[in-house]
Structure formats: C-alpha cells, structure tokens
C-alpha cells in the first residue's frame, strides 16, 4: 500500500469513507484533513471508528463521527489513532546533516505495536545485512517493550520515550 492513501483503503466497510477525497491516511495510524477551501476558518473532519487523538492539542476524540475543527492557516488537522507508536528524530537544519543517533518515540495511550527499520540510508549495505529491525509494543499499562529482530548496524545511542496520555 502507498504511504499516503485514501481512508477507504483502511476503512473499506465504513461507507462514509467511500467517496471522501479531502482526507487521507499517512500509513495506517495518522489521518490528515487539510483545509482545501479558500478562506475557511473551520473544517469538518470525519474520524472513522476507534479512538483518535488530535496531534496538536492531544484531545481524545471518539471515532465514527464528523467533528468541526478550527482551521487556522498554520495548522493542518492531524489525528493519531490511539495506541500508535510514532517515531521521530531530533530537528535538524536539513535531512542528512549527520547520522541519526537518537530516536524519539511518541507512545499514544492504548495497545499498539510498531516495527522500526534503521540503516545508513546511503548505500546498498542493507543487502548484506547492515541494518537493524526493532519491534516496539505496548499495552495500556504504560510499559514499552523493545525487541531487536535483526542487528547488523550500530544501534541508536539513545531512544527517548514520550508517553502521550
């Protein structure tokens, strides 16, 4: 599946997603609802079933409904599925300035699992096994379990965990 995809690919049984063309999924855990109407100050957003978290405000919202969201020019409405483990890297001037030594994981309340791939991003050394594959999982108890499924590359020096209640 493509990284950016229509909601219907994730929620094919939900008839509300069948003709939706102004919201999309980023992977299976993030929903983006960009403002597409000029001059709009509010945006109607459909959230499929399940629990969602507003990425910006961290407000929990029940899915299976339409909501009205303020739509300032500088903020795209983004919603995170409960239980998501969202990977991030520290802010850089531009990508590729240095090797990534720190991984930041935002862990959203609920049960979830995430596989993370790490290599140098520069060559084909991964074909000879020069990569790491991690599996992170958690349940509602707030504990994050890390398993290294494949080790063939220097591990992160630091993995910072940020719990999002």
Where are the predicted features?
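Catalytic core of carbohydrate-active enzymes
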Residues: 1-164
């Amino acid at each position: 599946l493509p990284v950016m995809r229509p909601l219907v690919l994730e929620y094919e049984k939900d008839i509300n997603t069948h003709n939706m063309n102004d919201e999309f999924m980023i992977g299976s855990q993030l929903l983006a609802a960009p403002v597409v109407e000029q001059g709009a100050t509010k945006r109607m957003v459909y959230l499929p079933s399940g629990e969602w978290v507003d990425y910006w405000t961290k407000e929990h919202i029940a899915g299976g409904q339409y909501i009205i969201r303020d739509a300032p020019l500088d903020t795209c409405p983004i919603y995170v599925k409960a239980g998501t483990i969202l990977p991030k890297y520290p802010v850089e001037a531009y990508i590729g300035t240095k090797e990534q030594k720190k991984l930041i994981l935002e862990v959203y309340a609920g049960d979830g699992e995430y596989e993370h791939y790490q290599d140098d991003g520069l060559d084909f050394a991964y074909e000879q096994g020069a990569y790491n594959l991690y599996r992170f999982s958690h349940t509602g108890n707030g504990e994050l379990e890390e398993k290294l499924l494949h080790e063939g590359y220097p591990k992160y020096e630091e993995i910072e965990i940020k719990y999002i209640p």
